[in-house]
């Protein structure tokens, strides 16, 4: 199709590109990321990337399918990614935050969509980020079926961007995990995290700022950055393998609020969790953060996962089998506590 130009060619014309939005750059990005997305596709995905909407057929193996959705971002962990030009794994964090959330209700993640917003689109950087998103989707077994790249001049500082993700999964109606069956004497298993995951970075950055340039930080800077920016662990495949073998009473993704807030979210009012901190090995990174930030024990447990990224609650007779299944799936697992009866007005969690 041709469009005639009736304006005076001698005048200085304003275009979308001169206004700060490069449509051609956006199109180049789409072509670059298509192969990454293609590797994530499942048989239920109908069509490819580029349509107005993404189509996905609910798997036929479910009798009473219930869709479970979740959305999240990466928070100020992005600031460290910008500072150290580490863009290749931040997309894994984005996927992990949503798929781990829907996983705790027993849902199998089906598909994922992303939102990438920036002031000026750097195609190379955006491609690294979205390749990481695709890698996260592969780890979670879900399809990257669409997304949005928004170039918005004046909205973000140069070199910075923001991310949001959206995941949808499915679970049988009679297999939804909601914690309602948790009883006294059930056991609490903790699965190791890969680091802080994507929470607590405003506090982390404050600690780093306080000690910037000081020679006595106690850790090599490269090691420290690697530890902080380690991508959030995706627990989907190991947890789904566990759910296929035995009944799980409760799951909790340890995100913002730490152990203190996230475990009580799944407990009935009649019980409380007793957690023993000596039962697992807290990674040295958290010791460094606590020491150099002069952070209280309670604040650490309220902000960080402290080395535990996912909680699994099972009946005592299933604990050993559950541990073995999770370990065979590559997880590091500890029995970190148990469930006790709770009297009205008493705490829903005690960590000693």
Swiss-Prot record:
GO biological process, one term: adenine biosynthetic process
Organism: Nitrosomonas eutropha (strain DSM 101675 / C91 / Nm57)
InterPro entries xref list: PurM-like_C_dom, PurM-like_C_sf, PurM-like_N, PurM-like_N_sf, PurM_cligase
Family per record: Belongs to the AIR synthase family.
NCBIfam families noted in UniProt: purM
Keywords linked to the UniProt accession: ATP-binding, Cytoplasm, Ligase, Nucleotide-binding, Purine biosynthesis
Pfam families in the cross-refs: AIRS (PF00586), AIRS_C (PF02769)
Protein's UniProt name: Phosphoribosylformylglycinamidine cyclo-ligase
Reaction catalysed by this enzyme: 2-formamido-N(1)-(5-O-phospho-beta-D-ribosyl)acetamidine + ATP = 5-amino-1-(5-phospho-beta-D-ribosyl)imidazole + ADP + phosphate + H(+)
EC number: 6.3.3.1
Encoding gene per record: purM
Annotated metabolic or biological route of this protein: Purine metabolism; IMP biosynthesis via de novo pathway; 5-amino-1-(5-phospho-D-ribosyl)imidazole from N(2)-formyl-N(1)-(5-phospho-D-ribosyl)glycinamide: step 2/2
RNA-binding in keyword set: no
GO cellular component, one term: cytosol
GO molecular function: ATP binding; phosphoribosylamine-glycine ligase activity; phosphoribosylformylglycinamidine cyclo-ligase activity
Localization per record: Cytoplasm
């Amino acid at each position: 199709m041709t469009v005639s130009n009736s304006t005076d060619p001698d005048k200085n014309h304003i275009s979308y590109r001169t206004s700060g939005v490069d449509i051609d750059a956006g199109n180049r990005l789409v072509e670059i990321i298509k192969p990454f997305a293609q590797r994530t596709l499942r048989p239920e995905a109908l069509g490819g990337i580029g349509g107005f909407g993404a189509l996905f057929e609910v798997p036929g193996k479910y009798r009473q399918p219930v869709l479970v959705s979740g959305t999240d971002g990466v928070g100020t962990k992005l600031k460290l990614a910008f500072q150290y030009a580490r863009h290749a794994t931040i997309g894994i964090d984005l996927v992990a935050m949503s798929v781990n959330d829907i996983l705790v209700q027993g849902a199998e993640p089906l598909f994922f969509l992303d939102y990438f917003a920036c002031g000026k689109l750097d195609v190379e950087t955006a491609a690294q980020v979205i390749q990481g998103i695709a890698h996260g989707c592969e780890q979670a077994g879900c399809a990257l079926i669409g997304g949005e790249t928004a170039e918005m001049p004046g909205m973000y500082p140069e070199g910075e961007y923001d991310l949001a993700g959206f995941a949808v999964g499915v679970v049988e109606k009679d297999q939804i995990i909601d914690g309602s069956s948790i009883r006294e004497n059930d056991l609490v298993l903790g699965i190791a995290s890969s680091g802080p995951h994507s929470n607590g970075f405003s506090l982390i950055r404050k600690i780093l700022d306080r000690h910037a340039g000081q020679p006595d930080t106690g850790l090599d800077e490269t090691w420290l950055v690697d530890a902080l920016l380690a991508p959030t662990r995706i627990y989907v495949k190991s947890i789904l393998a566990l759910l296929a073998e035995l009944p799980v009473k409760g799951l909790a993704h340890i995100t913002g609020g730490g152990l203190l807030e996230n475990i009580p979210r799944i407990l009935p009012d009649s019980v409380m969790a007793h957690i023993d901190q000596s039962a697992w090995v807290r990674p040295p990174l958290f010791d460094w953060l606590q020491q150099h930030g002069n952070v209280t024990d309670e604040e650490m447990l309220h902000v960080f996962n402290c080395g535990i990224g996912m909680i699994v609650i099972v009946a005592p007779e299933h604990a050993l089998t559950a541990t073995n299944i999770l370990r065979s799936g590559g997880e590091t697992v500890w029995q970190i506590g148990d469930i006790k009866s709770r009297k009205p007005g008493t705490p829903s969690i005690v960590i000693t």
